[in-house]
């Protein structure tokens, strides 16, 4: 029962009418309805919560004549349940009691005070600290797509104009949003498969004019020209929808979202979705984070540094000036060993980026202020450490760190050393910060001394030696006397509570003091909460500068991390060349060398204008895929400013990296392994350029031998002669090793292996020239294929090789075998290609249609 007909509300009890009205306003999310110490869920929400969270499904009487399914969870455990729900993409509206049950007539007044969705989280208990938490919106135009992402936990707002479906797929893979908003008529829902937290939004939320007004109001500007995004129509529509959604869910000002940037694909090396997946940059093929490039490179000191490192990995730079600026900073940190002390200093900063977002949203907790105080207190020491460094990029970052002595002093005066988790019960504001607060606290805290004095005085006055003065939250202050001595109490003692062996009393004097103390406690807490809110007002004027401090510290963390990784893992600084090419001496795979049980065999690669394609042959398990991937990873690492696992590396300009490595069925889209392989191949052949790095592994193996060989040959030929891309082309079709004899710039290399009797030893070394054989039977034996099968295979192999040898004299050269007949010219197509449809009148178009039918 998620959509309620208001005509039916009268059938229900007053409390259920209140619940159903609120549920109708939040029909697309679970409603946590506060009742005392529990959050209750009813009807379909209860059933879903029971299933998702493993909590009991019960019933709460009847309303409207029907039993009410119900599930509940204790309020103090809500954060753990919320974490489970947002991880699976479920949104939650939290409804609290805001009225006083003692004075309420009918149901206690309630209000939805918080909406929790996967993409709008800021609470550190719900966030993955070392991963971005992105909310995305996508809008489809007549041509192309608009894409926007926002990290509410940091304020980072980015848009992109994307021309093709493939570009959108790559962006989704790169940004990996946890929640996606899409319009009602979005036509590429297949791209969203596998993403959680998908939200279908009405078309009007993407209205262009409304979006512009929203963004101008948010940024406080008259236009968007200053952001360089005024012409990004589709992505601005996506950004507008996203902004409205965040406003609706956060229900507060969003001052930390103060800028928007445009992602331009021309600024970074383009990596399509298949390449990001195949290279296992931040996620392995099983969906985890172990044994990825990020896992090897990430020894950052802060969570915000880890997040920016992953963004760098997915956005390798093309501008050599920016790359060299990072390299110079890393080199200086390494040469001076400054990275060692810097790591410890940065580690103490914590996650200032997300703390500032919570401050902006006014959801920060006392310990956030304490961490900010600590970070600001460390700034002078950090500035001193950086003052000896002269690399331009480091100097620039140092300037952005800033100094905040007034804010640090304020927090030192205001917040106790070890504040509690919440402001709810007080104890956050330091003594001496506010004299009125100290006075009210003094009245409350002096109660224990007063009670001791009162107890001694009453014992002496009454002569009752069992008399005690105490307090509990239910009955307040009391004088306790044993039942045996209760007959001795004075007349002014009024019985308050009877226990098994005791009687409890109150006196007019004690009652008056109780009211005074309880009043002082309430006033102290109210004043402390007021002072707490004022702290936000005093810190937030420096919000933008503090955000800049966080960004600069995070980037320094990554650069320091690069220096440490270079030292620890034996990486060298790559050289950047203006000439196209990739030349690597003693290159290593950054991930495999860390997990391998045996020493990793380093290998070279040489690609340049006169040597643009390598045909890579060798046995299965010989290391072909590892070799190819390491070339791509070293190239990528060089373009993020990181040192690389190689003896030496000279890297030229790269515009794209493509990989066609491995494949599996795409059952969700109904595509076979071979179809996936051919789709990825087509993407490469259409989009690769002479400045691209292309890795092609086992093209054509998903179909018949001759079909596969023909496709592999033609793809290699096209890349070598038409595109001219730098290509590593691994294959088991030995016919392709003839390509170097037929085409300039194509060379053979192979992964070496040694055969001894029926066994094989993989040398994992790259040698010039083609492999002599594939060693398939030996690899099968190593895999545990039964001996009978291996023997039968050997016999069959001898028969086939003998037949091939007999036919050697009549064999057609491979290029002739693969040559296709020249296409016959089609007069209809010739006529069609000569026409400009924009110049045709309706009558001419109709006449042309009849003519084309005749020609065909």
From Swiss-Prot:
Pfam families: MutS_I, MutS_II, MutS_III, MutS_IV, MutS_V. The keyword DNA damage applies. One of its GO terms (cellular component) is cytosol. GO terms for biological process: mismatch repair. Coiled coil: none annotated. One of its GO terms (molecular function) is ATP binding. ATP binds at residues 618-625. Keywords: ATP-binding, DNA damage, DNA repair, DNA-binding, Nucleotide-binding. InterPro entries: DNA_mismatch_repair_MutS (IPR005748), DNA_mismatch_repair_MutS-lik_N (IPR007695), DNA_mismatch_repair_MutS/MSH (IPR017261), DNA_mismatch_repair_MutS_C (IPR000432), DNA_mismatch_repair_MutS_clamp (IPR007861), DNA_mismatch_repair_MutS_core (IPR007696), DNA_mismatch_repair_MutS_N (IPR016151), DNA_mismatch_repair_MutS_sf (IPR036187). PROSITE patterns: DNA_MISMATCH_REPAIR_2 (PS00486). PANTHER family: DNA MISMATCH REPAIR PROTEIN MSH1, MITOCHONDRIAL (PTHR11361:SF34), DNA MISMATCH REPAIR PROTEIN MUTS FAMILY MEMBER (PTHR11361). Belongs to the DNA mismatch repair MutS family. This protein is involved in the repair of mismatches in DNA. It is possible that it carries out the mismatch recognition step. This protein has a weak ATPase activity. This is DNA mismatch repair protein MutS. It comes from Shewanella baltica (strain OS155 / ATCC BAA-1091).
